[in-house]
Amino acid sequence: MSMFCFQCQETAMNKGCTVKGVCGKEEHVAKLQDLLIYTVKGISDVVVKGKIEAAGIPEVNHEVLRSLFMTITNANFDADAIQKQITKMISVREGLKAKVQAAGLHDAALFNADGRDAMLEKAASVGVLVTENEDVRSLREMITYGLKGMAAYAEHALNLGKEDVDLYKFMYEAMASLLDNSFGADDLVALTLRTGEYGVKAMALLDAGNTSKYGNPEITKVNIGVRKNPAILISGH
């Protein structure tokens, strides 16, 4: 199987895209996205096992948000940009490791991949289907997608001057847990529920950012007629 992605509701045959995404995503882009997520999990492993306080690593926090946000549905299919981000996050990971004593690190916190070919080769061994148990796999991915959505909200909130260090703490904890094979289905169900809780907190943070900057939404009358002057077409996803 050249790729596997079932991140959205429009996947091929409602099972997953295995040759090319229905969205147009190419195989190599899907694999690079998988490796970027794996790299962020490795950073989380270092943060958790090295007992690093999220409040003390703001730049790392922001890069983690950016990395997760890059992999959401239809956000970024630029292979060069994703490859560059993988390289950056490996460097970030190594910088963290140099500052702490963290024993028993996972492969995600240890591997290196220099260049596109090496990255694609590594990506083939860390994709979604590496988790054989379907229930565990599904729960892990549900949590991952929840974290991606959370990162998107948190990134937008950050651009509005709002952030919450507790969100970063949870993200690191959750992503590190996704590397732990001792986490069974029951543990992952509990983590899924917590992911939802923090997702709501991220939404509240973004709402606070929007309302503090733009005010509270109000019912407003607008002209919906057609004119000859230029218009702006707005679409949503």
Cite the ranges covered by each PLM segment.
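Metallocofactor- and cofactor-centric catalytic cores in central/energy metabolism, strongly enriched
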Residues: M1-H237
